[in-house]
């Protein structure tokens, strides 16, 4: 939610929509990746909880980028675009726990799981930074 408010306030101040979308998304994804990458090296469960909380908060900021970009791309078809993208995203939600369970069984450690998650966030943040657009694609 905070990402949406932040993005809207920056756009109202005159910043270009594309710049704002990319900025909040990059902050959210790369900031979240930084937090996740530190988790395997923590000895205290409190520091792990704090880092996971920061990761979630930063994910909320990223929603002001990728989460509302659907409306930029196809204002008339936002619901359909969100539904399609959400359906594709659910594939990861189904597969991730299975893969994490297999990795835990094989290694007995969360280290690789957090590294994979960090890589996905870094890749997603950089991909969005270079390829995101706000021009209407669906009319």
What is each PLM-predicted segment?
Residues 11-13, 69-79:
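Paired intracellular helix-loop junctions of major facilitator superfamily
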Residues 20-23, 102-120:
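A membrane-interface helix-boundary motif in multi-pass transporters
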């Amino acid at each position: 939610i905070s990402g949406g408010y932040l993005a809207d306030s920056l756009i109202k101040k005159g910043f270009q929509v594309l710049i704002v979308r990319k900025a909040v998304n990059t902050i959210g994804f790369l900031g979240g990746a930084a937090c996740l990458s530190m988790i395997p090296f923590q000895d205290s469960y409190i520091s792990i909880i704090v880092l996971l909380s920061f990761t979630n908060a930063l994910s909320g900021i990223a929603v002001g980028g990728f989460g509302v970009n659907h409306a930029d791309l196809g204002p008339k078809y936002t619901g359909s675009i969100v539904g399609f993208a959400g359906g594709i995203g659910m594939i990861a939600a189904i597969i991730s726990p299975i893969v994490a369970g297999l990795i835990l069984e094989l290694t007995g450690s969360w280290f690789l799981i957090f590294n994979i998650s960090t890589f996905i966030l870094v890749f997603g943040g950089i991909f969005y930074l270079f390829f995101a657009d706000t021009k209407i694609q669906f009319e």
